[in-house]
Amino acid sequence: MAMLKKRKHERTEQDCEYFQCYSDVSVHEEMIADTVRTNAYKLALLRNHSSLQGKTVLDVGAGTGILSVFSVQAGAQAVYAVEASSMSQLACQVVKSNDMENKVKVLNSSVESAEIPEQVDAIVSEWMGYALMYESMLPSVIYARDKWLKPGGLILPSCADLFIAPVNDLIVESRLDFWSEVKGMYGVDMSCMQSFARSCIMNKEMAVNLVSPEDVLSFPVRFASLDLNVCTQEEVRNLHGSFQFSCFGSSLLHGFAVWFSVTFPGENSVTLSTSPYGEETHWKQTLLYLDEEVQVEQDTEITGDVTLSPSDINPRHLRVLLNYSIGGGLRRTKQFQMGS
């Protein structure tokens, strides 16, 4: 297996921390064990066989190299697998184990420092993080597109959509109710702990959990879309959209769930969705909790807007600004973060 030479480059402390995370096998185990994710990429590549036959592919953030292997199986003649972490050494072994050394070249480099000797016909990348934008890998894909992708070349996936919906969270409800139940268990009244528990649970940190379809309180709204063929670096640094919901019925509103879908190009296009209405993925859903739960009724209107942007402290981390109004009431604002 040939390892392409790379020029020296500087990495930020945040980049080093990010790439080090991907040297841990558990990260790759979780991703590859996610059959919804992995099969979507495999199927999308195979369905683009006619477009990839004899072509050159760039795999951005190749990890273990599985997408590079899929690309060759789909007919690619040459694949450049760019991986900045030490996992690149294992990607070489994966490629060799599948007898693809003559077609897949692994480059241990960030994509911004990679030296790729030719233009490519397609780019494949699994760049999505929690709430789509956590870890901020999409700018690297755009960089690769602008530098190496031939005019009219393929990007897999080619578009992304973000969704939001109001939700009830039974786990949060149960945890808050627990403190009112302690007296019945031990004869000690600890209901005063409930407000403290609420401030700890419903804080400014985004949570990643599964949401049951029955806990979604209104039809979801798509609040942002990206066309990866044309979107700019500036556009992906500040994703913004508005929402308006009409609640299905009487319930406690604990917050909002955010999820995404990505779609691959082709006549028989493949969509990978992280919706609570679909099969479970390792991304689950991202939850934005209010400061306290609010009672809503049938047809209660909820309006507002949401903005996703990189953290000022660490651009790999995510910041979400939420503005909302419930039942025509006071407009409230809450800022969330993901990452320390």
Curated annotation (Swiss-Prot):
<feature type="active site">
    <location>
        <position position="135"/>
    </location>
</feature>
<feature type="binding site">
    <location>
        <position position="28"/>
    </location>
    <ligand>
        <name>S-adenosyl-L-methionine</name>
    </ligand>
</feature>
<dbReference type="GO" id="GO:0035241">
    <property type="term" value="F:protein-arginine omega-N monomethyltransferase activity"/>
</dbReference>
<feature type="binding site">
    <location>
        <position position="112"/>
    </location>
    <ligand>
        <name>S-adenosyl-L-methionine</name>
    </ligand>
</feature>
<dbReference type="GO" id="GO:0042054">
    <property type="term" value="F:histone methyltransferase activity"/>
</dbReference>
<dbReference type="GO" id="GO:0070612">
    <property type="term" value="F:histone H2AR3 methyltransferase activity"/>
</dbReference>
<dbReference type="GO" id="GO:0070611">
    <property type="term" value="F:histone H3R2 methyltransferase activity"/>
</dbReference>
<dbReference type="GO" id="GO:0042393">
    <property type="term" value="F:histone binding"/>
</dbReference>
<dbReference type="GO" id="GO:0044020">
    <property type="term" value="F:histone H4R3 methyltransferase activity"/>
</dbReference>
<feature type="active site">
    <location>
        <position position="126"/>
    </location>
</feature>
<keyword id="KW-0227">DNA damage</keyword>
<keyword id="KW-0539">Nucleus</keyword>
<keyword id="KW-0678">Repressor</keyword>
<keyword id="KW-0949">S-adenosyl-L-methionine</keyword>
<feature type="binding site">
    <location>
        <position position="61"/>
    </location>
    <ligand>
        <name>S-adenosyl-L-methionine</name>
    </ligand>
</feature>
<keyword id="KW-0234">DNA repair</keyword>
<keyword id="KW-0156">Chromatin regulator</keyword>
<dbReference type="InterPro" id="IPR025799">
    <property type="entry name" value="Arg_MeTrfase"/>
</dbReference>
<dbReference type="GO" id="GO:0005634">
    <property type="term" value="C:nucleus"/>
</dbReference>
<dbReference type="InterPro" id="IPR055135">
    <property type="entry name" value="PRMT_dom"/>
</dbReference>
<dbReference type="GO" id="GO:0045892">
    <property type="term" value="P:negative regulation of DNA-templated transcription"/>
</dbReference>
<dbReference type="GO" id="GO:0035242">
    <property type="term" value="F:protein-arginine omega-N asymmetric methyltransferase activity"/>
</dbReference>
<protein>
    <recommendedName>
        <fullName>Protein arginine N-methyltransferase 6</fullName>
        <ecNumber>2.1.1.319</ecNumber>
    </recommendedName>
</protein>
<feature type="domain" description="SAM-dependent MTase PRMT-type">
    <location>
        <begin position="15"/>
        <end position="321"/>
    </location>
</feature>
<comment type="function">
    <text>Arginine methyltransferase that can catalyze the formation of both omega-N monomethylarginine (MMA) and asymmetrical dimethylarginine (aDMA), with a strong preference for the formation of aDMA. Preferentially methylates arginyl residues present in a glycine and arginine-rich domain and displays preference for monomethylated substrates. Specifically mediates the asymmetric dimethylation of histone H3 'Arg-2' to form H3R2me2a. H3R2me2a represents a specific tag for epigenetic transcriptional repression and is mutually exclusive with methylation on histone H3 'Lys-4' (H3K4me2 and H3K4me3).</text>
</comment>
<dbReference type="GO" id="GO:2000059">
    <property type="term" value="P:negative regulation of ubiquitin-dependent protein catabolic process"/>
</dbReference>
<dbReference type="GO" id="GO:0016274">
    <property type="term" value="F:protein-arginine N-methyltransferase activity"/>
</dbReference>
<keyword id="KW-0804">Transcription</keyword>
<keyword id="KW-0488">Methylation</keyword>
<keyword id="KW-0805">Transcription regulation</keyword>
<dbReference type="InterPro" id="IPR029063">
    <property type="entry name" value="SAM-dependent_MTases_sf"/>
</dbReference>
<dbReference type="GO" id="GO:0006281">
    <property type="term" value="P:DNA repair"/>
</dbReference>
<feature type="binding site">
    <location>
        <position position="37"/>
    </location>
    <ligand>
        <name>S-adenosyl-L-methionine</name>
    </ligand>
</feature>
<feature type="binding site">
    <location>
        <position position="83"/>
    </location>
    <ligand>
        <name>S-adenosyl-L-methionine</name>
    </ligand>
</feature>
<dbReference type="Pfam" id="PF06325">
    <property type="entry name" value="PrmA"/>
</dbReference>
<comment type="similarity">
    <text>Belongs to the class I-like SAM-binding methyltransferase superfamily. Protein arginine N-methyltransferase family. PRMT6 subfamily.</text>
</comment>
<dbReference type="Pfam" id="PF22528">
    <property type="entry name" value="PRMT_C"/>
</dbReference>
<dbReference type="GO" id="GO:0032259">
    <property type="term" value="P:methylation"/>
</dbReference>
<keyword id="KW-0489">Methyltransferase</keyword>
<keyword id="KW-0808">Transferase</keyword>
